[in-house]
Design a protein with these regions (language model features):
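A short helix-coil junction within the Rossmann-fold of NAD(P)-dependent oxidoreductases
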Residues: 1-5
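Rossmann-fold scaffold of SDR-type NAD(P)-dependent oxidoreductases
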Residues: 11
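Residue(s) in the substrate-gating loop at a strand-loop-helix junction
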Residues: 14
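Active-site-adjacent segment of SDR/Rossmann-fold oxidoreductases
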Residues: 19, 40-51
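Active-site loop immediately N-terminal to the catalytic Tyr-X3-Lys motif
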Residues: 19-25
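Active-site helix of classical SDR
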Residues: 30-33
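C-terminal beta-strand-loop-alpha-helix "lid" module of Rossmann-like NAD(P)-dependent dehydrogenases
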Residues: 46-98
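Core catalytic loop region at the nicotinamide-binding pocket of NAD(P)H-dependent oxidoreductases
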Residues: 52, 92-141
Length: 175
């Protein structure tokens, strides 16, 4: 690409690179890293005529939620309530959605979007999915702090309703 002074690199990130969630530190921080790396390389590679961008999908019907696992520890059965509540909340959000582009799509929808972004001029960060547009709009209008408060309230009410389990659960995931 440098020799040709032309090329496009598309990194796949996630809407999870825009905000953190409890128990998703490793996943979300890796997505934040992809966003940051892409932004830095955008400036550097533009000197060689190379375009680099991210595509950050939101929720899609991919089976991703089936792979939720917080720890390989033998104590992981203690996290079953968290894992099951989180999976249920995510699945409930997806199952009643209309088809893409008005709701959640599938892997083919993301692949087509990535291809389109690779052959057209587009922004450095590109979001796909209705939830990504809603979250980005919310952050732009109300700021991240209000989003954090809402996430915390939803987390404690839907995912881990018994606050006394919070510290114990955290220690099993991160210690």
């Amino acid at each position: 690409m440098r020799k040709q002074k032309d090329g496009v690199i598309v990194n796949i990130s996630s809407i999870a690179g825009r905000f953190g969630l409890p128990f998703t530190s490793l996943y979300n921080s890796s997505k934040f890293a992809v966003e940051g790396l892409t932004e830095c390389l955008h400036y550097e590679l533009s000197l060689f005529g190379i375009d680099i961008k991210t595509v950050a999908p939101g929720s899609f019907r991919t089976g991703f939620h089936d792979s939720i696992n917080f720890t390989e520890d033998e104590k992981k059965e203690d996290l079953d309530v968290v894992r099951e509540n989180l999976k249920k909340a995510l699945e409930d959000g997806i199952k009643n959605e209309p088809p893409f582009p008005f709701g959640f799509g599938n892997n083919d929808d993301v692949a087509n979007f990535v291809f389109k972004k690779s052959i057209t001029k587009s922004k450095v960060s590109n979001f796909i999915g209705r939830d990504t547009k809603i979250i980005n709009f919310f952050i732009k209008i109300f700021g991240r702090e209000l989003l954090f408060k809402i996430i915390k309230k939803l987390w404690f009410s839907r995912i881990l309703p018994k606050k006394e389990l919070w510290a114990d659960t955290i220690s099993k995931v991160y210690c």
